[in-house]
């Protein structure tokens, strides 16, 4: 992988789609059909020049073998984005929407060497203390609570009312958040993921996590925050906050996409426009494997910075420039024919590889499996409210994420509605378009419908009122 004298920077031939709109990973064309771009890129080599956002250039690795060589070679490919020359030189717009996912933070995602080992050990050993039985119970309780909010209605957006909220509330549980802090954490993380007033949301997120760390130093519990505090690495408050932010960022968005994409696959069945491997009759485990292969929740990420000019299979990767791994393209590499035929769990790169491989593969899989089984068992007649070909995907270079997942089902009574707990209201404006003008369907009258209005609580406070945890 050392530089070779004859190696030249990769350049796509004129007229190739790589020189046209598909070069940009942030447009609606890419969101609608990313594999068209990956196929075009792959015909020109293991890597391709891309634009992540206006004014933000990078290289995308699209070959499985090349991706492994980058992921497994930290001596030549660093993760510390302070090496990014264009950013240091002021050539990257500071208001770019991709910077929050790329700028340096002192957590185990953006560090190298001994510092990475110290931080990662604290994180992995804290995660290893999670009890799988307790984790499943926590997911089931949160799932029951969320399902109760829409089960009387007969319609729902399973992406925004279920897959998105479940991991947010679960992390409140795993972090040991009191009601008020959990409400603020849920609100701020939702705003950050949705790109709404990000600066204010980031400030609120920092404030509530620092408060949480202070509380857990005084009153530790059986939760990840306390375990990180107690770890022999001796993390400072700022370091604790940064690891918690990393855990939420790396856990919430991918988890909701994994749940949402798998539900789409299973509900689409044999509809035209359904994902390539039809979901009819799939077991949940098979659906998750299919998504990790074909629609990985994080499609392009794991940004590396070559420490010097490096030749990779005939392509020169310039020093101190961002090199991203396309997990989606690497998984669809034609060279993986045998592995793809069996969807071998050991061959796809959805969890990454090398020293930065995802440390939460097992709990993340358990969470998605439990969440999907719970909704399918509780609402057995779920069906898509739109054709599979009509679902929209969120634009952006990093994720493979649905905009919404509208479904219909037979309304039934909420099991905990009599407790007098009112979750944050879902208005028709928040529901996908098919529900706004749809003919009315019979529904069970909520038992709290005639109660006087109460002061609105956040999602986490409302959940705690139900379960008293």
Predicted feature residues:
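A translation/RNA-centric and nucleic-acid-associated enzymatic feature enriched
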Residues: 313-314, 319-335
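Conserved cytochrome P450 K-helix E-x-x-R motif and the immediately C-terminal K′/meander segment
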Residues: 279-313
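Short hydrophobic alpha-helices at membrane interfaces in multi-pass membrane enzymes
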Residues: 235-241
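Active-site substrate-recognition loop segments, prototypically the cytochrome P450 B′-helix/B-C loop
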Residues: 2-159, 168-186, 190-192, 434-438, ...
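Cytochrome P450 heme-thiolate "Cys pocket" and heme-binding signature region
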Residues: 338-405, 413-421, 431-433, 439, ...
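Cytochrome P450 catalytic-core helices
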Residues: 241-248, 252-279, 359-379
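Cytochrome P450
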Residues: 173-177, 264-277, 332-334, 414
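Cytochrome P450 catalytic core segment centered on helix I
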Residues: 175, 184-233
């Amino acid at each position: 992988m050392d530089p070779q004298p004859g190696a030249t920077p990769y350049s796509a031939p004129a007229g190739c789609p790589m020189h046209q709109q598909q070069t940009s990973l942030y447009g609606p064309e890419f969101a609608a059909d990313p594999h068209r771009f990956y196929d075009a890129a792959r015909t020109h080599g293991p890597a391709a020049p891309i634009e992540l956002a206006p004014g933000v250039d990078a290289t995308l690795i699209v070959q499985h073998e090349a991706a492994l060589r980058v992921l497994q070679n930290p001596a030549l490919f660093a993760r510390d984005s302070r090496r990014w020359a264009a950013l240091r030189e002021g050539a990257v717009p500071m208001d770019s929407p991709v910077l929050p996912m790329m700028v340096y933070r002192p957590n185990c995602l953006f560090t190298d060497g001994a510092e990475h080992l110290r931080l990662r050990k604290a994180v992995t050993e804290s995660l290893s203390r999670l009890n799988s039985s307790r984790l499943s119970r926590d997911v089931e309780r949160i799932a029951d609570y969320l399902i109760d909010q829409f089960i009387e209605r007969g319609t729902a957006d399973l992406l925004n009312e279920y897959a998105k909220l479940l991991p947010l509330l679960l992390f409140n549980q795993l972090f040991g958040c009191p009601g008020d802090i959990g409400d603020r954490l849920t609100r701020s993380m939702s705003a950050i993921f949705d790109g709404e007033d990000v600066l204010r949301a980031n400030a609120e997120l920092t404030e509530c996590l620092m408060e949480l760390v202070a509380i857990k130093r005084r009153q530790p519990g059986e939760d990840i925050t306390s375990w990180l505090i107690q770890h022999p690495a001796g993390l400072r408050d700022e370091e604790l906050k940064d690891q918690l932010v990393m855990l939420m960022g790396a856990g919430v968005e991918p988890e909701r996409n994994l749940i949402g994409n798998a539900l789409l696959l299973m509900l689409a069945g044999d509809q035209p426009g359904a994902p390539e491997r039809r979901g009819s009759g799939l077991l949940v485990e098979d659906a998750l494997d299919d998504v990790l292969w074909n629609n990985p929740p994080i499609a392009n990420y794991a940004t590396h910075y070559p420490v010097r000019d490096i030749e990779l299979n005939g392509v020169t990767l310039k020093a101190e420039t961002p090199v991203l791994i396309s997990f989606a393209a690497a998984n669809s590499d034609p060279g993986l024919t045998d592995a793809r035929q069996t969807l071998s769990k050991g061959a796809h790169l959805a969890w990454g590889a090398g020293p930065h491989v995802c440390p939460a593969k097992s709990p993340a899989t358990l969470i998605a499996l439990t969440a999907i089984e719970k909704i399918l068992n509780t609402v057995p007649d779920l069906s898509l409210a739109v054709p599979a070909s009509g679902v929209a995907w969120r634009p952006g270079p990093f994720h493979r994420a649905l905009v919404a997942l509208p479904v219909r089902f037979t309304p039934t009574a909420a099991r905990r509605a009599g407790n007098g707990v009112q979750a944050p209201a879902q208005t028709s404006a928040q529901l996908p378009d098919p529900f706004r003008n749809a003919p009315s369907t019979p529904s069970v009258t909520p038992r709290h419908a005639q109660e006087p209005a109460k002061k609105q609580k956040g999602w986490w406070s409302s959940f705690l009122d139900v379960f008293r945890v």
